[in-house]
Amino acid sequence: KFQAYADALSAALPEGCGFNTEVVAEVWAGIANAHRDYFRYGDILNSIVETNVSVEKLADFKRVYYEGVNKLTPQLISILGIKEEHIEKFITTIYYQGVGLCGWCQNNPLVHEALKQLQIKRPELDFKAEMRDFISMCIAWYQQK
């Protein structure tokens, strides 16, 4: 799932594209929205997957992840002007926001019923818009570091 997500980011945000922060955030949010299954897997990654697979399988998974990060790094540095030492943290921060929002945005009938019984109205969240705003905020933060 990560490879497809990273490939989509790489294709949509080529070096020298000249996109400003708002455009990068909008494009990235659209890609995140199209790859929500990647973020859903992230919801179980640390607690289930990474604790129940062989070291070899985990190493294969991590290799694909870091190859994707390494491929994106020069592009993101070029486009965003974020220092190399901050790129992995930048990507990871966006990832965990996506994981959290996907967990929040999922339609779970049991949760809906429990909240209905408690007469709690949960606010509607727009995953893409929330991701866009968060990515824009992260870009601004990491650019000034």
Listing of model-derived features with the role each one plays in the protein:
Residues 29-71:
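Short secondary-structure transition hinges
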